[in-house]
Amino acid sequence: MSLEIEKIHAREILDSRGNPTVEVDVWTCCGFGRAAVPSGASTGTYEALELRDGGDRYDGKGVLKAVRNVNEVIGPKLIGMDVIDQRGVDQIMIEMDGTPNKSNLGANAILGVSLAVAKAAASSLGMPLYRYLGGVSATRLPVPSLNVLNGGKHAGNDLSIQEFMIEPWGADSFSEALRMAAETYHALGRILRGKYGNVATNVGFEGGYAPPISKTRDALDAIMAALDVTGYTEEIKLGLDSAASSFYLDGGYSVDDNRLSPGELIDFYVELVKTYPIVLIEDPFEENAFEEFAELTKKLPDTIIVGDDLYVTNMARIEKGIRMRSTNALLLKLNQIGTVSEAFDAATLAYRNSFKVMVSHRSAETEDSALADVSVAIGAELIKTGAPARSERNAKYNQLLRIQEALGSSASYAGRRRWS
């Protein structure tokens, strides 16, 4: 059966930080798909390139060039193609762009089309997106890794570490995990408000609190106090996203008002894992520190060490990390690589080498909930899409609740008391 692409149209919309982004619509005879593209605040040097307009309009952040590339360049080329040929569609766009980082047409233009095509295909076949992309084996719900306390580039405080996350590995289902996390989030808010005043419950880009805290251990202690209140000290574990490139300069790292060498930073993480129930650390070093990543992974064999800026969902960099045993997990962001098929290829490579996969949002998001479907389709162990607050974050969590409901008794949960 051939379901031809009949029309493609892009427009400029606003993301959750009030900046422009690309939204793409795709039509077939009997289906429709709409996709909106996210954007990051802390971005890796090696990511696929977002095309921005420059100039005065929207402080240079407009995306009309990318929109025109969809409407005038990409769209006409894809009209008449089979919407089910996802890899063929993606490959044509890659070839049309002709650059390693998609800087000609723009990764924001290409991803918008790629994801909208996938949605249109699912719609045309009368299937949910997770089932279309993942097949009959797409039944596992990921463990949510919720960023409840913000620092770094995601907040206006003095914390070096960018994200402090809670992960309900001990829940029996995704819905129970989300409930536990939401209860803990609100308990944390009450604790922070009582200690620091109302200003402490201002939130960062991803919905996590941004209190006037400057020390890593103070942030972790606040979260542990919240877990004591909710009683989920066994069910919920902790994760960190250091985003260490943001506090790296001239061979050293500035953490908690201290200047640390790479070796001292390794010791810092090891001590934190000994003291707190931390089971995951993302980007513990700057984006080219493959050797330091490998040393930490070796020293903490029971901890999930995740590469984000290290890999930027790029196959060549993932392969290097595999050879060097730099991490044991991949953070997968669709807009880092720019097409649906390349993202799935990256996940497949990770799984073949016994990596875990953590699907992730960006700090500037939209109401698009496709990330939830992608996480189930890929079979990801984890999903990171912010605190259980702000609608652009909860859009993903709520979609996972719907998927769990639709799957019924066939639904499974990636946690199941692994660290309890």
Curated annotation (Swiss-Prot):
Pfam families: Enolase_C, Enolase_N. The active site is at 206 (proton donor), 333 (proton acceptor). Pathway: Carbohydrate degradation; glycolysis; pyruvate from D-glyceraldehyde 3-phosphate: step 4/5. Its EC number is 4.2.1.11. NCBIfam families: eno. It is found in: Cytoplasm; Secreted; Cell surface. InterPro entries: Enolase, Enolase-like_C_sf, Enolase-like_N, Enolase_C, Enolase_CS, Enolase_N. Belongs to the enolase family. GO terms for biological process: glycolytic process. It comes from Methanothrix thermoacetophila (strain DSM 6194 / JCM 14653 / NBRC 101360 / PT) (Methanosaeta thermophila). Keywords: Cytoplasm, Glycolysis, Lyase, Magnesium, Metal-binding, Secreted. Disulfide bonds: none annotated. (2R)-2-phosphoglycerate binds at residues 162, 333, 362-363, 384. Its cofactor is Mg(2+). It catalyses: (2R)-2-phosphoglycerate = phosphoenolpyruvate + H2O. GO terms for molecular function: magnesium ion binding; phosphopyruvate hydratase activity. This is Enolase. Mg(2+) binds at residues 241, 282, 308. Catalyzes the reversible conversion of 2-phosphoglycerate (2-PG) into phosphoenolpyruvate (PEP). It is essential for the degradation of carbohydrates via glycolysis. PROSITE patterns: ENOLASE. GO terms for cellular component: cell surface; extracellular region; phosphopyruvate hydratase complex.
